[in-house]
């Protein structure tokens, strides 16, 4: 579970930068092209308690991602396109003795684009809330315990059955203004924390010529639940989230902030286990996140950064409510990071996560991590 989570979150920004920028061109003729992109990320992490010299755990998070993107020119301004992206966990043995699946299909979608009318595609893609939450994912080697970046959790992170319409510059009428409309079909026959009912989402972005960008995203869905007592399936409403964010990216400075609020979103199982979660109610009625990051480019290859995350859960619907407060800190951390870019393909990095949560009985019962983490690695991306 931990390996898969780390693989899913560790390098999304590097791949976004490599896709189309540093990608290897396999074929390009008559407006038709096929590109190969990916990354290899050997890295290691050490955990230790606050003010303790003893290392509590070691972890190898080495992974790789490989993607193919293609485009076919159908008519004058009509194109079809497709992307498939695969993640590989390189820290596991060749033959697993259990049924864990360390490798996964991250993305897989296809669609059409027609001039200023925009594009439409369907498949496994990024949820609409990722558009704004990605503003603070500037440091790709930081594993943020943010519920708004979890995958297969409605329209946050990557998810299945997404019909996505994108339009840049509002049909060519307003420079810098773009929007995304998204519909997610019902997903079932999977773990309860990964099912969802149908839902809709929208994201609006405005970019200026001076490096300022503002984004607002939201979605609303129904939660799919299986009532094992009578073997009947039912849909319950009121699952959704919204996020507001901005960034400044100019003059060698990158500053971004994100505020997100969700209702009835499902956290990872290491926070609220199946034994604690109520089968009749969502796990957390209200979740609030504040995220911020600042980075500077020294033009010598060094890119130091400082980031902050504060995630709170309110009105928790879990059993034994007398021993668990209704409001709970899910994550609170500061990340001090730096990376050095040897060239456009190779970089090395180091990150120190200061966990601001204090260990107590409630934190321990909910399996919320409180250790500080040191991580370092090398990334080759193309």
From Swiss-Prot:
Superkingdom of origin: Bacteria
Main location: membrane
Stored Gene3D superfamilies: Porin
Membrane topology qualifier: Multi-pass membrane protein
ATP-binding in keyword set: no
CC annotations in GO: cell outer membrane; pore complex
InterPro entries according to UniProt: Gram-neg_bact_OMP, Gram_neg_porin_domain, Porin_dom_sf, Porin_gammaproteobac, Porin_Gram-ve
Keywords tagged on the record: Cell outer membrane, Ion transport, Membrane, Porin, Signal, Transmembrane, Transmembrane beta strand, Transport
Signal peptide residue numbers: 1-23
A GO molecular-function descriptor: porin activity
Keyword Hydrolase recorded: no
One Pfam family in the UniProt entry: Porin_1
GO biological process, one term: monoatomic ion transmembrane transport
Disulfide bonds: none
Compartments it resides in: Cell outer membrane
Similarity field: Belongs to the Gram-negative porin family.
Assembly: Homotrimer.
Function: Forms pores that allow passive diffusion of small molecules across the membrane.
Name assigned to this protein: Porin-like protein BU359
Taxonomic lineage of the native organism: Bacteria, Pseudomonadati, Pseudomonadota, Gammaproteobacteria, Enterobacterales
